[in-house]
C-alpha cells in the first residue's frame, strides 16, 4: 500500500500500482474527465502511470500552473508528428518546452518556409482533433537504438547511446507516431488543446556545437486557453515595437555587423546615452565610498591558471599567442585583477571594508547562435565592484549594497519584481556547515534591508550563495539585473591577506557585486522599457530647436545656444522643410522636446514646446523654458541635491522633488 497526502491535508491509502486516473475516477467522474496529470511528492507523472511511492499528491487539470510546461511539451511532439506527416524523410532530434513556449529541431535538406508554418499549424490542429492516445513504454536500450536506426532516426539513436547505463529508456507512442522521451505527457492529443501558434524559424547545431550538422528549429508558443494565447501574442507585438535592435538603428544609437559578431558599434547618440548611464552610476558609487580602478585587458595564461579561470572557463576565453610564445587572454572577468590591487601594499583590518569599482571591459566567447543585440554580446562593460571585508562585516555591507541597488534601479524607472536568494547547487565547494552559515548571512542581510527574498534552490555559484535582482519592465517582462555574491575561494587562491587587530594574517571575504551588470544589456533593457522614449535626463538628444521659416534661423541659433548653456543636449534643425515633417522625423527619433520657433516666437523671444506623444504645445519665454527644462533634465541624484524646501520648479509649476 502507498499513502497519499491530499492538498487539504487528508491522508488515504491505495494499493501499489494504482494510477492517477483511477484515483480521480474514485473522487468524481467530472474530475476524471478534466484530469491530465498527477503530482506525487513534487514529481509530475502521466495519468495512466502506476504510482510506485506515496507522498504529497495533487490531481492537475489544464488550468493548473504546474501543467503548462507539460502542455507545451506535448504540443512540441504534435509539431514533430505534423512535420513528419507533411515532409516524409525529415528526422527529429529534440523538442523541449521553454519559457513561454517550445521548439523542435529537425534535420531536413530543404529549408522550411513561413508558408510551411501555416500548413504545419493546420496539421497540428487536425492531430489534436484525432484525440490520439499517448502512452508510455519502457524499451530495451539495444533494441531502441536498433529500431530508431532502422527507421532512419540517427539522431535519436545517438541520444540513446549517450543516456547513462542503468537509466530507463522510455518511448511515448502518440497514435502511430512515437518519440524517445522521459515524459510526462497528457492522456491524449486532445488534451493539449489548440491554444498554440508557431512563431518563427531559426537555425541550430546538433548538440549546440557549430562543428556538427546544422538543423532547422521551429519555435512556437502554447497556453492553457485561447485568452492566454491572445494576451501573449499582444505582448509579443508590443515587445516587437520595443525591440532595442530596431530602435537602436531608428534612433541612430548603435549598430552591429557580421565582421564583429557580438561587438557593438556605438554611434554618437548611443555613446551619449552610455556616458549618461555611466556618469550617474559613477556618482552613486563615489557617494557610497567606492574607489574606482582599472585593470589590464590582456593577461598571461599563468595568471588565469592561478585564479582558476583557465580550468573552469577556458572555452569562453579569447586566447592569443605572441611571437615569444606567451599565451595571453582577454579578461573575461574583473575580479582577479581587483585582488591584485588589494594585495599591492599591506592592508590592515582598519582598511576594511575596501570597496573597489571598475567599469571593466570584458570579453567572453558566446556561440554566434546565442548572440542577441545588446542582450547577449561577446564584448561588454560591467559596472563591476568587489568589496573586501571581514567576516563580521558581510551582513552590513550586503545590506548597504541592497539599498544602493534598489535606489539606482528605481532612479532608472525599473520596478523590482523580487530579489532571489540563490542557494547551494548540487556541485559545490565547501561543507554543509559553510553553506548553512553563508546562506543565513545573505538572508539576514536581505531582511536587514527590508527585503524578503524568494528562494531559488540550487541556483547559487559553486563557491557561495548570491542575491539576484529580478526587475520588471513597463510591459511586465522580467530581467535579471544586479547581483551580490559571497566568495571565500578567490582570496584564498590568489593569496589576499590583511593584518588583523591581533597582528595575525587573515583572508578577507570578497563580495562580488554589480547593479547594472553588463552596461550593454542594461541599456538594451532601458531602450525596451521606455520604447526609446527616455525621460529627459537620459535622452541622448533632449531638445531639438526646429524652425518654421528661415526668417527665424538667427533666433533659433540663439535659442539653441541658451539651452546648451544650461547644460541641455540640443540639436538645431534649420532645414527648408515643413514643420510637420520635422516634428514627425524627430518624433520617430524619440526626441522628448521639440522647441518650435517661427517669426512670431522670434519677435516675442519665446519658444513653442512640443512634447513627444502630445499634440499640444506650450508657449514659454525662452529664458523660462531653458530654466525649467534644465531643472527637469537633472539626473535623479542631482535633482535630489537641488531640492529646496521639498519642491522644485518644472514646466507644470511646482512638483514634489525626489
From Swiss-Prot:
Q: What is its EC number?
A: 6.1.1.3
Q: What is the catalytic activity of this protein?
A: tRNA(Thr) + L-threonine + ATP = L-threonyl-tRNA(Thr) + AMP + diphosphate + H(+)
Q: Which InterPro entries match?
A: aa-tRNA-synt_IIb, aa-tRNA-synth_II, aa-tRNA-synth_II/BPL/LPL, Anticodon-bd, Anticodon-bd_dom_sf, Beta-grasp_dom_sf, TGS, TGS-like
| Location(s) in or outside the cell | Cytoplasm
- Report the record's Gene Ontology biological process terms: threonyl-tRNA aminoacylation
Provide a Gene Ontology MF annotation, just one.
metal ion binding
Task: Decide whether keyword ATP-binding is in the record.
Answer: yes
Q: Tell me the SUPFAM superfamilies matching this sequence.
A: Class II aaRS ABD-related, Class II aaRS and biotin synthetases, TGS-like, ThrRS/AlaRS common domain
Give the record's family classification. Belongs to the class-II aminoacyl-tRNA synthetase family.
NCBIfam families on file: thrS
Protein name according to UniProt: Threonine--tRNA ligase
Amino acid at each position: 500500500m502507498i499513502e497519499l497526502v491530499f492538498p487539504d491535508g487528508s491522508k488515504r491509502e491505495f494499493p501499489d500500482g494504482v494510477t492517477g486516473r483511477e484515483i480521480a475516477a474514485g473522487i468524481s467522474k467530472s474530475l476524471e474527465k478534466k484530469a491530465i496529470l498527477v503530482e506525487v511528492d513534487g514529481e509530475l507523472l502521466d495519468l495512466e502511470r502506476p504510482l510506485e511511492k506515496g507522498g504529497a499528491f495533487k490531481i492537475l487539470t489544464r488550468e493548473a500552473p504546474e501543467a503548462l510546461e507539460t502542455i507545451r511539451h506535448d504540443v512540441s511532439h504534435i509539431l514533430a508528428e505534423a512535420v513528419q506527416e507533411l515532409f516524409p524523410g525529415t528526422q527529429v532530434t529534440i523538442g523541449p518546452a521553454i519559457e513561454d513556449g517550445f521548439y523542435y529541431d529537425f534535420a531536413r535538406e530543404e529549408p522550411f518556409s513561413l508558408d510551411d508554418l501555416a500548413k504545419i499549424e493546420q496539421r497540428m490542429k487536425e492531430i489534436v482533433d484525432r484525440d490520439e492516445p499517448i502512452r508510455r513504454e519502457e524499451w530495451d536500450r539495444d533494441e531502441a537504438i536498433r529500431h530508431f536506426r532502422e527507421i532512419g532516426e540517427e539522431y535519436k539513436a545517438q541520444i540513446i547511446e549517450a543516456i547513462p547505463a542503468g537509466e530507463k529508456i522510455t518511448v511515448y507512442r502518440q497514435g502511430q507516431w512515437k518519440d524517445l522521451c522521459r515524459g510526462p505527457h497528457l492522456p491524449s492529443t486532445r488534451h493539449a488543446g489548440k491554444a498554440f501558434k508557431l512563431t518563427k524559424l531559426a537555425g541550430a547545431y546538433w548538440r549546440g556545437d557549430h562543428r556538427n550538422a546544422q538543423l532547422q528549429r521551429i519555435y512556437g508558443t502554447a497556453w492553457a486557453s485561447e485568452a492566454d494565447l491572445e494576451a501573449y501574442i499582444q505582448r509579443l507585438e508590443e515587445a516587437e515595437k520595443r525591440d532595442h535592435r530596431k530602435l537602436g538603428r531608428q534612433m541612430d544609437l548603435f549598430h552591429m555587423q557580421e565582421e564583429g559578431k557580438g561587438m557593438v558599434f556605438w554611434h554618437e547618440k548611443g555613446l551619449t546615452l552610455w556616458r549618461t548611464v555611466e556618469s550617474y552610476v559613477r556618482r552613486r558609487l563615489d557617494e557610497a565610498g567606492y574607489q574606482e580602478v582599472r585593470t589590464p585587458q590582456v593577461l598571461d595564461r599563468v595568471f588565469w591558471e592561478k585564479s582558476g579561470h583557465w580550468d573552469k572557463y577556458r572555452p569562453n576565453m579569447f586566447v592569443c599567442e605572441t611571437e615569444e610564445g606567451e599565451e595571453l587572454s582577454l579578461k573575461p572577468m574583473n575580479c582577479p585583477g581587483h585582488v591584485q590591487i588589494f594585495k599591492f601594499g599591506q592592508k590592515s583590518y582598519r582598511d576594511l571594508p575596501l570597496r573597489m569599482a571598475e567599469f571593466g571591459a570584458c570579453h567572453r566567447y558566446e556561440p554566434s547562435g546565442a548572440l542577441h543585440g545588446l542582450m547577449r554580446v561577446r564584448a561588454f562593460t560591467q559596472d563591476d565592484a568587489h568589496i573586501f571585508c571581514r567576516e563580521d562585516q558581510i551582513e552590513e555591507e550586503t545590506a548597504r549594497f541592497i539599498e544602493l541597488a534598489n535606489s539606482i534601479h528605481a532612479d532608472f524607472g525599473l520596478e523590482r519584481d523580487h530579489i532571489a536568494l540563490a542557494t547551494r547547487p548540487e556541485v559545490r565547494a565547501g561543507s554543509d556547515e559553510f553553506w548553512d552559515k553563508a546562506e543565513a548571512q545573505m538572508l539576514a542581510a536581505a531582511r536587514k534591508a527590508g527585503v524578503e527574498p524568494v528562494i531559488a534552490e540550487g541556483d547559487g555559484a559553486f563557491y557561495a550563495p548570491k542575491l539576484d535582482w529580478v526587475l520588471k519592465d513597463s510591459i511586465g517582462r522580467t530581467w535579471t539585473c544586479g547581483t551580490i555574491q559571497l566568495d571565500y575561494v578567490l582570496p584564498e587562491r590568489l593569496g589576499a591577506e590583511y593584518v588583523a587587530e591581533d597582528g595575525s594574517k587573515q583572508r578577507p571575504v570578497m563580495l562580488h557585486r554589480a547593479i547594472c551588470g553588463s552596461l550593454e544589456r542594461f541599456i538594451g533593457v532601458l531602450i525596451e522599457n521606455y520604447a526609446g522614449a527616455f525621460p529627459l535626463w537620459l535622452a541622448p538628444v533632449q531638445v531639438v530647436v526646429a524652425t518654421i521659416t528661415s526668417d527665424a534661423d538667427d533666433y533659433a541659433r540663439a535659442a539653441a545656444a541658451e539651452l546648451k548653456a544650461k547644460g541641455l543636449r540640443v540639436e538645431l534643425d534649420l532645414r527648408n522643410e515643413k514643420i510637420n515633417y520635422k516634428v514627425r522625423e524627430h518624433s520617430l527619433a524619440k526626441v522628448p522636446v521639440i522647441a518650435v520657433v517661427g517669426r512670431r516666437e522670434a519677435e516675442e523671444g519665446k519658444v513653442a514646446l512640443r512634447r513627444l506623444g502630445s499634440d499640444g504645445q506650450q508657449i514659454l519665454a525662452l529664458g523660462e523654458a531653458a530654466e525649467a527644462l534644465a531643472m527637469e533634465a537633472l539626473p535623479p541624484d542631482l535633482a535630489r541635491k537641488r531640492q529646496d524646501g521639498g519642491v522644485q520648479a518644472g514646466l507644470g509649476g511646482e512638483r514634489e522633488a525626489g
